[in-house]
Amino acid sequence: MIVTRFAPSPTGYLHIGGLRTALFNWLWARKNGGKFILRIEDTDLARNSEEATKAILEAFDWVGLDYDGDVAYQSKRFDIYKRYIQKLLDEGKAYYCYMSKEELDRLREEQMKRGERPRYDRRYRDFTGTPPQGVQPVVRIKAPLEGDIVFEDGIKGIVTIKAEELDDFIIARSDGTPTYNFVVAIDDALMGVTDVIRGDDHLYNTPKQIIVYEALGLPIPRFYHVPMILNEQGKKLSKRDGAMDVMEYKKMGYLPEALLNFLVRLGWSHGDQEIFSLQEMKELFDPKDINKSASAYNLSKLQWLNAHYIKNTPNEKLVKLLEEFGLFLSDHDKKEILLDALKERAKTLQELADMAKEILEAPKNYDEKGVKKALKGEWKAILELFLQKLKASDAHLPSDFHAIIEAVVEEKEIGFGKIGQPLRLALLGKMAGPDLSDVMAIIGKEETIARVEKLIKEKGNS
């Protein structure tokens, strides 16, 4: 059975690179009818944040990635790690190192002066003397002294690290807390993880973890190291580029379906297909197909995908989603016309809510450029004729309002723009927006009259 995991540290927000890693792991487990584990790597007690843990769980809930069993917390597993550290000490595969931080710093300075790579010199590896007084030792694992550590990466191919590049790394700090590479290997083995899909910034942690697996005789999982997401200039993604808390995307009005679709395409593809439902991703995804090179974050692509998903979201669902953006339409009798008119134009839910408010709320002022462009010639007479015909009608459907505009165009023998521009300015306060007939049907006959009369009153003598 395929078992994957996502193991964030709760020291900061979950950003989109992390969510992409989680998605890849989730897809591979679900495709194969396997298990997907969520593990919180909270051994760094000083830097952990309860808020960050909460935000990770909230993000998973929002995008709809479910996990199997309870969330695993490393901080609750210290007894397990201590047992395995003791096992390595008892078997002579690990040892206490009494070198102080000051001694280590001095050693590194001397090595750098000699042009050597700074590293621990293994002086306590086979130590049998009397330990120095007053030093709390760390525990180091005995790494191989020669040969190569070789593993096959599902994306990068065969990876070889020379043993001489690694020192006897610390597996327990002087306060007894275990270190990252040790606990990751223990947890992955004990949780039955078969496939580790993670960012390639972890590539050089892998040989250390393999040393732990081999020292304890534990099974080694398959590894897939995913290239980073870069900005459009090929540099590391910053917050300004989009490397922000996943929940910020929700606040900006992105749909989870769009974000997941966007992320799966950052580094993975299936022919020329761009739109993928979660079910399609599950059926088609294979980590072996992930690109070897880094992918570029493209905001316009995310907006294009989000617009697609908004357009295809049922109005009933949109009404509920838009409440988070201060737009309450459940009791509005023209909500269907409103949403149908706007969801073709919106890139985010925030945009959709803002556009709806621009229609539902009468304009407080008028765009200056629009005034200069639209309010010239006989605009006032044209709008007065429009009002006369509208007041005499019982217009309520878009087609009713459209017919009145057509009648004015015909009677005045003018182009559509001669009425369309001043009318749009009256209704919306600006020159761009959805179909005028839809706008009037949404706000109704009386409100249309009020807005047109207001423009004539304020600008008719200027």
UniProtKB/Swiss-Prot annotation:
It is an enzyme of class 6 (ligase). This is Glutamate--tRNA ligase 2. It comes from Nitratiruptor sp. (strain SB155-2). Belongs to the class-I aminoacyl-tRNA synthetase family. Glutamate--tRNA ligase type 1 subfamily. It comes from the Bacteria. Its EC number is 6.1.1.17. Keywords: Aminoacyl-tRNA synthetase, ATP-binding, Cytoplasm, Ligase, Nucleotide-binding, Protein biosynthesis. The keyword DNA repair does not apply. A motif ('KMSKS' region) lies at residues 236-240. GO terms for biological process: glutamyl-tRNA aminoacylation. It catalyses: tRNA(Glu) + L-glutamate + ATP = L-glutamyl-tRNA(Glu) + AMP + diphosphate. ATP binds at residue 239. It is found in: Cytoplasm. Catalyzes the attachment of glutamate to tRNA(Glu) in a two-step reaction: glutamate is first activated by ATP to form Glu-AMP and then transferred to the acceptor end of tRNA(Glu).
